[in-house]
Amino acid sequence: MKFDVIIIGGGLAGLACGIRLAEQGKYCAIVSAGQNALHFSSGSLDLLAKLPDGRAVSQPLSALSALAELAPEHPYSKMRNITQLDELVQEAEALLRRCGLDIVGSSAENHLRLTPLGSCRPTWLSLADIPVAPLNGPLPWQRVAVIGIEGFLDFQPQMVASALQDQGIDATADYLHLPALDRLRDNPSEFRAVNIARILDLPENRQPLADELSRLSSTAEMILLPACIGLDKSAPLDALRAVVGKPIQLLPTLPPSLLGMRLHQALRHRFQQLGGLVMPGDAVLRAELVDNRITGLYSRNHGDIPLRAAQMVLASGSFFSNGLVATFDKVYEPILDLDILSLPHRADWSHSNLFAPQPYLQFGVNTDNHLRPLRGGVALENLHAIGAVLGGYDPLQQGCGAGVSLTSAVFVAEQIISEMAVTL
């Protein structure tokens, strides 16, 4: 099986890279092992919220020079040696909008998103259904009704309302009861956001839901709900807003996250619409190397039939997705045994304080400035690495996980397009 480009991993980075390549007419295949980290996403995407020394960042692009001094191995720092990062960021934003995603935010300045705990966190882009506020401004509501779903344990409205009250908001907490959900409620394992959304999205349930929300929010100017409506798109929520006559915003729930799934579905649909091939439920097990080039990939489902392409992209994720594997004494990349940025002594991998920066989160594949992975100190000629498999950054403490995924995806796609044009 032969393609122009094979991408290992179908998460945010892999899909974004595949979309950009397919938009330029490249025949791409994505080998995806299963559910990716987008199913755990809040629906907001971070670019850069904090520098490694702990300083908060309000304008991400203005902080890149300071970041390069503090963290030269950070993917942003490496990409800045080759191109202008602001161009990659702008293309990433445009790519998401071409996928049909209604997003708010800008790289010019972070904004605040409301979390399921009722606190605010800085971020770059958010789906339009998520409650947001200016970075240095007050929350834009005075009276808020936080409404949960009776029997739904993955969202606690009292916790959100209490946190909002601490911020000077007149917030109330309540639970709605909808008879249409009673069948799901009988089985707690079935009473999850995705299954609830399948019922709440039905047109026949819209009016009963609207009546219940109106009853519980009579004095509120805005309603906050758990993200349990609008499974595939926001149309059911828009229709509900029209009936209720008030703004309704969604807060992410415990996984699986409906907002994250919506991101994934939009990206995957765009990739396949452009002619890309997704191989779900498969995993690349090993690679065939000749003269520092990958000549074939062998996957679990295809056995001894190699997958061949002129260019390969490693977007296999971090520990969560098995893109990196940790044993008792080492961390390694399982397909090609690529060079890893890590620490030699296991005792140094983590800190006992759970909320302190954890060194292992910065572990990942080491690359050159073109994001070509190193193997024995030598860059592989036709392989690039993108997203969470990269080392040199802490996506949690620095608030840059999605930004690294999207910018590295666009960066590598543009390089591959240029290289293949020269080859032709």
From Swiss-Prot:
Q: Which cofactor does it need?
A: FMN
What NCBIfam families does this protein map onto? glycerol3P_GlpB, PRK05329.1-1, PRK05329.1-2, PRK05329.1-3, PRK05329.1-4
An annotated GO cellular component: glycerol-3-phosphate dehydrogenase (FAD) complex
Protein's UniProt keywords contain Ribonucleoprotein: no
- Domain of life of the organism in this record? Bacteria
Identify the metabolic or biological route this protein is part of.
Answer: Polyol metabolism; glycerol degradation via glycerol kinase pathway; glycerone phosphate from sn-glycerol 3-phosphate (anaerobic route): step 1/1
* GO-annotated molecular function: glycerol-3-phosphate dehydrogenase (quinone) activity
Give the EC number(s) under which this enzyme is classified. 1.1.5.3
Q: Where is the organism placed in the taxonomic lineage, from the top?
A: Bacteria, Pseudomonadati, Pseudomonadota, Gammaproteobacteria, Enterobacterales
Reactions it catalyzes: a quinone + sn-glycerol 3-phosphate = dihydroxyacetone phosphate + a quinol
Q: Which family does it belong to?
A: Belongs to the anaerobic G-3-P dehydrogenase subunit B family.
Q: State the Pfam families in the record.
A: FAD_binding_2 (PF00890)
The UniProt keyword set, sorted, is: Flavoprotein, FMN, Oxidoreductase
The cross-references to InterPro entries, in alphabetical order and at most eight, read: FAD-dep_OxRdtase_2_FAD-bd, FAD/NAD-bd_sf, G3P_DH_GlpB_su
Among Gene3D superfamilies, the record links this protein to: FAD/NAD(P)-binding domain (3.50.50.60)
- Annotated protein name in UniProt: Anaerobic glycerol-3-phosphate dehydrogenase subunit B
Q: Is Flavoprotein there in the keyword field?
A: yes
Native organism: Yersinia pseudotuberculosis serotype I (strain IP32953)
Its GO biological process annotations read: glycerol catabolic process
Subunit composition and interactions: Composed of a catalytic GlpA/B dimer and of membrane bound GlpC.
* Top-tier EC class: oxidoreductase
Q: What does this protein do?
A: Conversion of glycerol 3-phosphate to dihydroxyacetone. Uses fumarate or nitrate as electron acceptor.
